[in-house]
């Protein structure tokens, strides 16, 4: 006979119940969620109509066509790779659907390239398709490709960063002086900024250099599947800036949910920016290792072992260096274990790791050969994590991360991986 009391009190049951409760809350209480945030969001004083009050009224109405913001939020996406273009598509669909909240036009900054003698921006704007990075997907007509990052960002209330993270410093320098003081940002970037003073989230890097609040978006999201409208989930993390003054202060959780949520792209908004960011960055390192064992033909058992050790090290890294992060984020959110599973099953990084094992070529060579101008973010994150762990004397506490570094950058044979994880 099953001991019902013991079952209900077990940690596994409690964790599953909490997840189910969150899912039910998201499915059946979206309207009350928006109303609650609209009521409890902090207010600010500004000349003329109070933008926050207008936003609250719109979000609390079941049909909001009769109310319109005096100045709707302008949204810009910085980046146009396959994930950048996919997020821009999602956002542009929502600015069309909610003209009371958002300006219809969405600018997408595009690094200008020549495609068969034509500018990529011209192709996108005329054919409504990113033929290089997201071919075969029709883009909304209100999504406008812009070759100038400064012009694209001008007057934007919300900036969505979605570029390879190794280019962030250069882009931020170009944006300085062109971002309005009241703007808000969401980072879809995966990686860290490492310096002599420590390891830093990329959202924090954006905040410090552009002086605007920045959240993060991450989840179990393979870009081609989202772009096709296949159902998936994601997590947006954003902390309301209590001590910030600006006209963008009414960009809160409810507004962000309206901006990113689609019938095929379900969004949960939380405040754990650190947890979401760490999970999104480190899963790419784990995916490289997963690719190694799959490429060696060791099968699913070995891949599962890599993911177990990887998840443990991801959580340990977050707790050690970003104590404000929440452990439950890694288990309950799409940006945690769900993203790890998806990335290890079919992302760019597992593809590169597998190809390294099968061909003997370097990660850098394969990135150029296989990814059509895209980046394998795990290659760069692996180096950043190693630099930081070496700097603070913690390398031995993260054997998987160090093993991936040694394989990618020092030529250690992949066959040594089990030995390097003996005590993990």
Swiss-Prot record:
Substrate binds at residues 190, 348-349. Belongs to the NAD-dependent glycerol-3-phosphate dehydrogenase family. It is an enzyme of class 1 (oxidoreductase). The keyword Cell inner membrane does not apply. The active site is at 283 (proton acceptor). This is Glycerol-3-phosphate dehydrogenase [NAD(+)]. Keywords: NAD, Oxidoreductase. One of its GO terms (biological process) is glycerol-3-phosphate catabolic process. The keyword NAD applies. The lineage of its organism: Eukaryota, Fungi, Dikarya, Ascomycota, Saccharomycotina. InterPro entries: 6-PGluconate_DH-like_C_sf, 6PGD_dom2, G3P_DH_NAD-dep, G3P_DH_NAD-dep_C, G3P_DH_NAD-dep_euk, G3P_DH_NAD-dep_N, NAD(P)-bd_dom_sf. NAD(+) binds at residues 79-84, 111, 167, 223, 348, 377. Signal peptide: none annotated. Its EC number is 1.1.1.8. It catalyses: sn-glycerol 3-phosphate + NAD(+) = dihydroxyacetone phosphate + NADH + H(+). It comes from Eremothecium gossypii (strain ATCC 10895 / CBS 109.51 / FGSC 9923 / NRRL Y-1056). Gene3D superfamilies: N-(1-d-carboxylethyl)-l-norvaline Dehydrogenase, domain 2, NAD(P)-binding Rossmann-like Domain. GO terms for cellular component: cytosol; nucleus. GO terms for molecular function: glycerol-3-phosphate dehydrogenase (NAD+) activity; NAD binding; protein homodimerization activity. The gene is GPD.
